[in-house]
Each structure stands twice: as C-alpha cells, then as structure tokens.
Amino acid sequence: MNALFASTARGLEELLKSELESLGAQSCAVVQGGVHFEGDNRLLYQSLLWSRLASRILLPLNEFKVHSDLDLYLGVQAIDWSTIFSIDKTFAVHFTGTNEDIRNSQYGALKVKDAIVDSFTRKTGQRPDVAKQQPDIRVNVFLQRDTASVALDLSGEGLHQRGYRDLAGLAPLKENLAAAIVSRSGWQNGTPMVDPMCGSGTLLIEAAMIASDRAPGLHRTHWGFNAWLKHDAELWHELTSEAQQRASQGLQATTSRFFGSDNDRRVIEIAKANARRAGVAELISFGVKDAAQLQNPLPEGPKGTVISNPPYGERLESEPALIALHNMLGRKMKSDFGGWQLSLFSASPELLSCLQLRAERQFKAKNGPLDCVQKNYQLADTQGESAGQIAEDFANRLRKNLRKLEKWAKQQGIECYRIYDADLPEYNVAVDRYGSWVVVQEYAPPKTIDAQKARQRLFDVINATLIVLELPSNRLVLKTRERQKGKNQYEKLAQKGDFLLMEEFGAKLWVNLTDYLDTGLFLDHRIARKMLGEMSRGKDFLNLFAYTGTASVHAGLGGARSTTTVDMSRTYLEWAEKNLRVNGLTGRQHRLIQADCLSWLHNGHEQFDVIFIDPPTFSNSKRMEESFDVQRDHLALMKDLKRLLRRGGTIMFSNNKRGFQMDIAGLTALGLNAKEITAQTQSQDFARNRQIHNCWLLTHAGEEK
C-alpha cells in the first residue's frame, strides 16, 4: 500500500476527494490544497491517468524536523536515493516554504540538491546532473514551520498539462480547474453544452473528454515516474491500453454534443486544433460569433447547460462594456434557453449580478491568485423570468429626470447637461449627458462603506443607466471622483485623445470624456458663460484660471472687442485655442497667456471691461509660489482685480467652496460693490444642488448695476 498525496487548487479539495474515492482510493483525508490517500500500485497509476482535478500526485519519502540547514541536509541524505533513480538520470528540486532557519526557498532547494548529489557521490563516486527543464526526476520539498516533507513527484509536469493545448487565448483556465467547473455545473452526461465565450475551448474539451470516457492523462508523453526505479511498466501499459479502449468506445457511445463560439477567429482556430489533439473534435462545433448573436443551437431540445468563464476586466474603463455584456447574456438566457441550466465562473460576483438571475447554487475556488465564484442558475421554461429590475429606485429617478430635462435641454439649445446628481443617497454618482455619450462619475465612498457593496451599487447604476438611456456600452464613460491633490489635479487618466464637439447656446465647444478627470466643460457654469457673452459686446474681456477657455468663446461670440485667456496649464491653453478656432475666433485680439494667474494678476497693469475669474478652492501647485485658499485670500484677489478693472467695468467672481462667505466690509473698504447672483446662474439640471457654486458681480463703488 502506498501513502500518496494529490495537490489541487484551493477550493477543489472535497471534489478531488470524491474523485479519488471513485477511483478506489482509501483513507482519504482533506487538507488545505490537497488530499492524503492510500492505494496500491494500480491505484497510484490510475490516479495519475484518470484524475481530472489533481494538480500533482506525490509519493512521500521522508518527513523530519528542521531547526537548521544541517537538519535539512541530513534529513534529505537519509533517503536512499539510489533506490529511487539511477545516476544517469537528471533531477530537479522544487522547494516551497520557509522558517526561521531556512529563510529563502532557493537556498533550501540548493541544500536539498547538495544532499542528493552527495548521497550518490558517497555510494558511487559519481553525481547525477540537475536539469531545470523537463528533468527525469522531480523532488518536491515542503517546509512548514519546523517540519520538512520530501516527496517524489510522480506527475512530472503538472497534471493540468493534458497534452492537447499548445496555445491559448489571453486568459486560459487550467485544465483541472476547467474540469472542476464542468463537474460543479450541474451538466448531465448525454445532454448538450454551450459556451458562448469559449476562448481556446478548454471547458468544452474537458466536458467532451468526460462525456467520451477519455482519460485526461492519455495524451501525455512525459511522466515523473518514467525514471523511477520502482516503476511498473507492464502495469502502466495495461492501464493505458484499457484507457485507450474505453476512449474509443466512449466516443462512439456518447450522445452529448458541444457548441462553442467566440468573437476572435484566431482563438477559435486554436480551439479547433486543441479539440483535434484531445481526440474529441467530432463532438464539438466551434464558430466565430459575438455573444450578442448567441442563439440556442437546439431550440426543439433536448435541454442542456450553458457554461462559460466570461471576461471580468481589470481596468475601470472596461466595466461599462462588461456590465452590458452580462446584462445582455442574462436576457439571452431568459429568451432563448428556457429550461436549460446556466453555470458561470467569474472573478467578479458583482458582474454576475448584472445577469438579473437568481443563482441556485454557488461555489468558491481560486484561479491562480484570484478569488473566484461559480454560480449555477436554473432557467425557467417560460420566457421573461427576472430577478427584478436592478437598482429600480435609481432607474425610476433617472427616467423621471429625463422626462423633465430632455425637452428643456432641446429648447435651451444645449447638448451637455446633468441627468442625475446623487439624488438618492445610496447611489452616490453624477450622470452627465454629452450628446449621444454619458459620463458616470462615482463619488468615492467613505472608508466606512464596504468596498464590495459600493462596487455592487456602482455596477447596478451602470447597468440601469445603459438600460434606461438605451445606450451602447461604448458610449458610457466611467470615472471615480475623489479629492484631488497636487499633480493629480492635472494628471492624465488616459491617452486616447478623443475630442467631441458639443453645442451650447450656439457656441461650439470641444470636450474630452476619457483623458482627464474633468471633461473640459463645467456644466454648472453654463448660464454664467451665457451672461458673460451678453455682457461683453464691444468690451475687452479677461478670463483668469481659464481652464479650456469656454467663457472666452462665449465672450468672443458675444461681440467682445478682445479676449485674454490666462491659465497655468499649456494643455488647457491649447484646448482653449482649439475652442476659439472652431468658433472662428482667431487673430491677435484673442490672446492666450500661460502664467501663474495670481502672479500675472498681481503684476499686471492692463485694464479690462469684463473680468471672469473662477479660482480653485485651494491650490498648492509647485508652479505657484505659495498656496491659495479662496476663503482666506479672496480679498487680496479682489484688490488686484480692482486695479485691472476699468471704470464702468464688471468682475464676475465664482468659486465652488461650500459655505463661502464674502467679506462685504472688506470689499467696501477697497471701494468695490458686490452683488450675489448665484440663483440666477443655476440651471434646471442643477436645481437639487444649490451649493455647487456661488457667483458674484463686482463693480467699482458708486457704479451699481
């Protein structure tokens, strides 16, 4: 009787135990990462040939205490290696674990190698060679606390390497994990299986091998036991011959059929080649097809299982498309696959919620470093089953706001407006429309909110937005807003360089929805820009902290004699120049100046009739000589502005500080009058957020308007 150990992916241990018991294993004991079991030589070989779930099969050789590197050396040398492999064979050591004495796994592997080599040298005067690539013998050492376990790896390469897959798609599943997913899916042998995002076909191939009774190890040519001196070649030949016969009979007997599709033609060709090498090509129909074109291949029956490992995405910008994909998949399941089972394996349970289906069972497993979940669904025979509208209250509010705002925006002649602004506390986002595009901005949740719950709500919001606005996923841009500090205020988010031309009260304005946190157009200042256009006819106009120069455009189109646009950012000034040019505002009368606005203002001597200034609430940029706080410093700012303001002129001063208090007494002492016009500058789409900005008109004393 051999004491053996089968390793597997975390989360698959109980499944592996059941599989080993079905092969005849005895004394099975589950531990984290594998199963200890016992069996004779026949069972040893059968576990290697037939286990679909094991990663490796190990034959323990010795276990001993390690309190120093000498203990490790002596414990390994105590094994009679000459009874395990001969001097002409190569070997390699795989060492995992550390303790206080062996702090580096590479050092541990080196000590083990030395012990094995010295063992041979003392007995034979010769030493075996070490081979890092495909060694004849692989020695596995696991060190945990003060105990080392030494084993012979009978597998050689990992058992997931069945021998049928040369190439894979971008994110392949290991074959033993794929077999586990199939085993847990609820699929019944003899029924059809569909994978609408099959990639290189691993799930379908593993299922077809199960259906046709094909041993997963049948195609492997190299094993860790080939050079083992106790290898029973005759028994192995008997078992592989039996497996060949079973595979041949199973292929003829199975009634299961498999259907796979993917939108990548190259990957489908790889899947076909893999299926041919696995010996199951005649059971699987592969085709190039987008998941949106998915149809039931057997609409008249029998019922089967849809199984897949859909993409889950790592980048924020990919999430709207993935949410739309899962929502579409859920609708397809309900409309075309009534009575079937659905089983999806994903690293994102939040995306699975976008199916709008209720899972009957779920399992956890690791896919490499990723924590994953497999959810099984029973699809109702009748069409239209639903788990209810996702984020129904958010969706209803969105519909209500749209009914009110769409007509208003059309009448006003604006393409860009806010549809939703954190109206409901649990959905803390802003939704802005830019023509046929939508930007969803998530306000970063407080640290007290569970991150997974916040992510789930965001996914629900995106899903509902796509549905309510009937929007293609590639027209939704997702951003996360949080307090910007230092260089992050101006840092690029992406490098797409995609600009869209929008219209606002007759002005054409360029926006960029993807590359920066802001889009180039502050929607809440829309009416202020219109007022500036009306105030500027025949006047010299100054725009400070100008951003992308949108106020300068309105002033120019309103008939300003000249416009001067000042900002510290070259990027934004180039953007402002584009905005002016597309509106025909070119020539020397439209100046663009790159400068620290506070320094330029403090040192300036030119005079202007209309000045617009929208400073940051706080700034400490390295390119500014000192920090700026709008509440603390606004009076000093007004002193400089007054010097540049012609008699009869007007300053429009706006800022975004909540609770801002204008120093009226200080202004009076400076010889300035102030009139708050915040209410007049707030439009219908910001009616719920009265504190988004405050706005003032200032004039020389005695010139009230």
Swiss-Prot record:
Broad class of the protein's primary localization: cytoplasm
InterPro entries in UniProt: 23SrRNA_methyltr_KL, DNA_methylase_N6_adenine_CS, RlmKL-like_Mtase, RlmKL-like_Mtase_CS, RlmL_1st, SAM-dep_methyl-trfase, SAM-dependent_MTases_sf, THUMP_dom
This enzyme's EC code(s): 2.1.1.173, 2.1.1.264
Record GO terms (molecular function): 23S rRNA (guanine(2445)-N(2))-methyltransferase activity; RNA binding; rRNA (guanine-N7-)-methyltransferase activity
The UniProt record lists the keyword Transferase: yes
Keywords for this protein: Cytoplasm, Methyltransferase, RNA-binding, rRNA processing, S-adenosyl-L-methionine, Transferase
Domain (THUMP): residue spans on this chain: 43-154
Highest taxon of source: Bacteria
Family matches, as Gene3D superfamilies: 3.30.2130.30, RNA methyltransferase domain (HRMD) like, Vaccinia Virus protein VP39
Record's keyword annotation contains Glycosyltransferase: no
Localization of this protein: Cytoplasm
Reaction(s) catalysed (UniProt annotation): guanosine(2445) in 23S rRNA + S-adenosyl-L-methionine = N(2)-methylguanosine(2445) in 23S rRNA + S-adenosyl-L-homocysteine + H(+); guanosine(2069) in 23S rRNA + S-adenosyl-L-methionine = N(2)-methylguanosine(2069) in 23S rRNA + S-adenosyl-L-homocysteine + H(+)
GO cellular component: cytoplasm
Function: Specifically methylates the guanine in position 2445 (m2G2445) and the guanine in position 2069 (m7G2069) of 23S rRNA.
Family named by the database record: Belongs to the methyltransferase superfamily. RlmKL family.
PANTHER family assigned: RIBOSOMAL RNA LARGE SUBUNIT METHYLTRANSFERASE K/L, RIBOSOMAL RNA LARGE SUBUNIT METHYLTRANSFERASE K_L
Protein name, entry field: Ribosomal RNA large subunit methyltransferase K/L
Species in which this protein is naturally found: Pectobacterium atrosepticum (strain SCRI 1043 / ATCC BAA-672)
